[in-house]
Amino acid sequence: MNNNLQGDAIAAAIDVLNEERVIAYPTEAVFGVGCDPDSETAVMRLLELKLRPVDKGLILIAANYEQLKPYIDDTMLTDAQRETIFSRWPGPVTFVFPAPATTPRWLTGRFDSLAVRVTDHPLVVALCQAYGKPLVSTSANLSGLPPCRTVDEVRAQFGAAFPVVPGETGGRLNPSEIRDALTGELFRQG
């Protein structure tokens, strides 16, 4: 996609995000659906769309670590833990951090933690940079169906009018690995 078309698609996506709606976009392995993490209305729309219970918690995807800092508590990390995390970012590894009390429950669910990732997908980096904050990110699929890997699959599952940022996934076969930021425990193999 040329830069003008990509810029137009990102601008259109930001308009949708500002309306507290949900968008779809390519990530490292599959298409994701996401929204503004600071909008309870938008997050509830996403959860309803996915038939996902609010208590499960969500993942935030960001262009850089600074975008994630308002949502996580990194004060307990040792230098070695930071080094491990930053050696994997940007990239397809999600880390679960402690969350401060200010992080909304619609993001953390029943947990006192939040899963976050600094992406290396160029389109998502550009989208998060243009929006100025991370996005809630979960796989683009309806309950019981496989995650979408193309724009056509997103439109088939969510409808032709669903707002999609066109682009290619990063080509990975598996979703992101998920690890505990403090212990390194593996929650999901990538």
Curated annotation (Swiss-Prot):
Q: Which InterPro entries match?
A: DHBP_synth_RibB-like_a/b_dom (IPR017945), Sua5-like_dom (IPR006070), TC-AMP_synthase (IPR023535), TC-AMP_synthase_SUA5 (IPR050156)
Q: What is its main location?
A: cytoplasm
Name residues in a coiled coil.
none
Checking NCBIfam families in the record gives: PRK10634.1
Enzyme class comes to transferase
Question: What keywords does the record list, in alphabetical order?
Answer: ATP-binding, Cytoplasm, Nucleotide-binding, Nucleotidyltransferase, Transferase, tRNA processing
**The keyword Phosphoprotein appears for this protein:** no
Role summary: Required for the formation of a threonylcarbamoyl group on adenosine at position 37 (t(6)A37) in tRNAs that read codons beginning with adenine. Catalyzes the conversion of L-threonine, HCO(3)(-)/CO(2) and ATP to give threonylcarbamoyl-AMP (TC-AMP) as the acyladenylate intermediate, with the release of diphosphate.
PANTHER family per UniProt: SUA5 (PTHR17490), THREONYLCARBAMOYL-AMP SYNTHASE (PTHR17490:SF18)
GO cellular component terms, semicolon-separated: cytoplasm
Query: Which family, according to UniProt?
Result: Belongs to the SUA5 family. TsaC subfamily.
Give me any GO biological process, just one.
regulation of translational fidelity
Localization of this protein: Cytoplasm
Record-level Gene Ontology MF annotations: ATP binding; double-stranded RNA binding; L-threonylcarbamoyladenylate synthase; tRNA binding
Protein known as:
Threonylcarbamoyl-AMP synthase
- Catalytically driven reaction(s): L-threonine + hydrogencarbonate + ATP = L-threonylcarbamoyladenylate + diphosphate + H2O
Organism for this UniProt entry: Shigella dysenteriae serotype 1 (strain Sd197)
Q: So what EC number does this one have?
A: 2.7.7.87
Which residue numbers delimit the YrdC-like domain?
7-190
Q: SUPFAM superfamilies, per this entry?
A: YrdC/RibB
